[in-house]
Amino acid sequence: MTPLRFPSNLPLRAVAFDEDQSMPHRRPIDAANDFVRRHIGPSPQDIAAMLATAGAGSLEQLVAETLPYAIRHREPLKLGAPLTESEALAHMSELGAQNQVFTSLIGQGYYGTILPTVIQRNILENPAWYTAYTPYQPEISQGRLEALFNFQTMICDLTGLDVANASLLDEGTAAAEAMALAERAAAKNAKAFFVDADTHPQTIAVLRTRAEPLGWRIIVGNPETGLEGADVFGALLQYPGSSGRLSDPRAVIAALRKKGALAVVAADLLALTLITPPGELGADIAIGSAQRFGVPMGYGGPHAAYMAVRDSLKRSLPGRIVGLSIDSHGQPAYRLALQTREQHIRREKATSNICTAQVLLAVINAMYAVYHGPDGLAAIARRVHRRTAVLAAGLQQLGFAPTHGNYFDTLTIEVGDRRDAIVARAEAENINLRINASSLGISLDETTTPATVEALWRAFGGSLDYAAVERDAGDALGTALPAALKRTSDYLTQPAFQDYRSETELLRYMRKLSDRDLALDRAMIPLGSCTMKLNATTEMMPLTWPEFGSLHPFVPKAQAAGYHALFERLETWLAEITGYDAVSLQPNSGAQGEYAGLLTIRGYHLSRGEPHRKVCLIPSSAHGTNPASAAMAGMDVVVVACDAHGDVDVDDLRAKAEAHSADLAAVMITYPSTHGVFEEHIREICDIVHAHGGQVYLDGANLNAQVGLARPGSYGADVSHLNLHKTFCIPHGGGGPGMGPIGVKAHLAPFLPGHPAEGEPLNGGLHGGGTVSAAPWGSASILTISYIYILMMGAAGLKRATEIAILNANYIAAKLHPHFPVLYRNPRGRVAHECIIDPRALKTSTGVTVDDIAKRLIDYGFHAPTMSFPVPGTLMIEPTESESKAEIDRFCDAMIAIRREIAQVEAGRYPIEQSPLRHAPHTAHDVTSAEWTRPYPRTEGCFPAPNSRTDKYWSPVGRVDNVYGDRNLICSCPPVEDYALAADYARAAE
């Protein structure tokens, strides 16, 4: 892809690094603070007015009243002065130039691909798509829900299975999720899982890491011979194998079924356009990566993984599932289905902590399939396979026979002591190969040309002509795909994959979908505990440059020098910001960060000869991923009570720490708390746990209230994960990607995650904290976003952002308190960066629910706050520092107007069932309907605020019927329109 560049006259050498490599420095100029001004919403005049409303004389006074004195960090962060946007881009260009973009034919789950420019511009680079939140509010998420529905349909069709989820984090973790599903669903009570030795090494490493704390044994071997007599609950088969081997797994799958074990197939999606899909082979579960459907390798990510299952396993499927339901008008509408089966809701009973996905990447994958259609995908697959066959024919002429006669796109060649010479010649051709002990692997892809194949032949010591080799090979080129495995079933026959083949039609389809959604490009998203702040355009630009996007994660380190300079500096900055001593960038979500952090604690206790330390104390207010992650790490959860103020009950914590002193592993605590308050006793909590031999895991979800003001590692925490997609500006992407790196104190550093690509042992041992993600540095390419954010903000800018985040939350609390009680405050009457309002008494008096308030906010043009977490029946509001006073006032005005509407119900003007609250959201169908029988005017329902008439967001559907959707589960196409009549019939039958 062609990178969008900045003016060529920028002085690239104007940016230098301090000796400590902490931050570029330059001569200060007034423009240095320009980005900080643009990132922060309120103007100086607004700040003064908001402080007055909040009852504070200055930001310093407000901060002093908000944070406990004992945790304040008084010294400026050692990050240096900020760069301007143009200087930052120049610096990123220099970093990118240090990366060498070779043609990487390493394979192993990562392949060159071509992202259609129409998708790059209108999805990947479009804030309407990348700034949206997870589609928990379906009425304002219909566009991306339809795109995810297409993704699920694509996965179901290609795998031949019944139900697919809306993506997972990467292939390695998808395999681990499949293993956990198999253990739960298998007919037998075995404690071992078989893994095909021809599975990608990073997948095996992730499986070993996941299995070890749970007491499961991983058996790696040849499934055709090693399964006999093995007592297993399931097996993973790579299809085609990591070495390229393509064999028929039907007999192995049948043998597994006889044992009462489940068959998991890790399948290549492009290959599945030509070979028999896993479902037709008898597989129970299929997993894999969708990366090669248009998403650059990005030095490891982000990429969408997939999982599909047979119908009987759908309620055990991890992650999110998009389903089709109906709205209040009986029209088709998408929603997230079967949400009560999501693992974070199951808390300590969970077998997974998955609560996210890779939505933006899955949307790209789906649009790639829409763009190419089934014929186009098959044509790409045939071209890749044919060029692989021509390559094999030429290698045979040169005396190198592929190890396997049947393959799709990957060859393994035994080369013996000629390996190093061949590798050197390949590198001279700017080609990377997969290097094994005595063999070389070559994986071709969509970007491979005849010239690439000829360069490979030169690396192997010959000079051959592609056209001549292809002509001479003749019919022999068609023998590498065995007849028994050739696909005969149709796929992607639905209109979505047929109707948008011209760029004009595809462009309009993507625009139509984005117009249905409400993202940050249209309005404030006040979700508590989500930190929906600005994702600045400059931060996003380097992401699509080839210098960052085109690197395979397993290239020689010297080819990724720019990336590694970025990693080193980012780790240093994050350590400085948090007060920790070491950082791992591998976890590719917040939940993965939790898991990795707990594994460091587990490893620490094991190293001290204390394997019995397994008790993890978790407050009752914790997010469900906390107990789920603890369960995955092999820990036993003990719940700690919260007091009437929402704080951890220190007496209960002390009693439980004493009761479990001999076995205490850790406490998991969120700070500021999930109740939106800085608890006064955080140091005491840390001291209590340490006194009983435990470690303190501090959940970094709310770090946006601490940066520059407090450092977890300085007030007693031992480890935290950091949500870069919250505090450090990686966009939420409609539900992913995210990044959850962890910071640790020095004594936990030896137990940070490792990776096979970095020398991890593959013999069943685990070094450090094992391997938690498929790639060594997780979703490396989006680290550029957080890096450039810190680069442009500097220490003072980051601190000011935190102060304004706290101000905005306290301003909202002050404005809304006369209308809705603010549930929790600290002893000085302050909230942190978010606040919880409590309408529960109104439900008692009028019947109004938080759902009614959330849906009515759509009519005012807003996404709802976080509903019923951490307290059922309440709303948690987080404005972030990026929202202006004008937008915050607009939101507060909407909430106050809704309170007046509730008062109308209280006064008896209309019952709640006939109120604009219960009928919300109001659609164009409502305002144009021939009949209007409601006891309030159309204008009151549809245009409740002054801006509604000039800048109206129309929900494309009425309120979605969740119960109907779960009772009539539909998770893949036929097209939406076909279900309108079915919905009518269903209602008539009721």
From Swiss-Prot:
GO biological process assignments: glycine decarboxylation via glycine cleavage system
Keyword Oxidoreductase recorded: yes
Catalytic activity as recorded in UniProt: N(6)-[(R)-lipoyl]-L-lysyl-[glycine-cleavage complex H protein] + glycine + H(+) = N(6)-[(R)-S(8)-aminomethyldihydrolipoyl]-L-lysyl-[glycine-cleavage complex H protein] + CO2
Enzyme class: oxidoreductase
Protein keywords: Oxidoreductase, Pyridoxal phosphate
Modified residue annotations for N6-(pyridoxal phosphate)lysine: 726
Coiled-coil regions listed in the entry: none
SUPFAM superfamilies: PLP-dependent transferases
EC number(s) reported in the record: 1.4.4.2
Cofactor(s) the record lists: pyridoxal 5'-phosphate
Superkingdom of origin: Bacteria
GO cellular component, one term: glycine cleavage complex
InterPro entries hit by this protein: GcvP, GDC-P_C, GDC-P_N, GDC_P, PyrdxlP-dep_Trfase, PyrdxlP-dep_Trfase_major, PyrdxlP-dep_Trfase_small
Molecular function via GO: glycine binding; glycine dehydrogenase (decarboxylating) activity; pyridoxal phosphate binding
Pfam family, any one: GDC-P
Subunit composition and interactions: The glycine cleavage system is composed of four proteins: P, T, L and H.
Similarity annotation: Belongs to the GcvP family.
Function summary: The glycine cleavage system catalyzes the degradation of glycine. The P protein binds the alpha-amino group of glycine through its pyridoxal phosphate cofactor; CO(2) is released and the remaining methylamine moiety is then transferred to the lipoamide cofactor of the H protein.
Protein's UniProt name: Glycine dehydrogenase (decarboxylating)
Organism, scientific name: Rhodopseudomonas palustris (strain ATCC BAA-98 / CGA009)
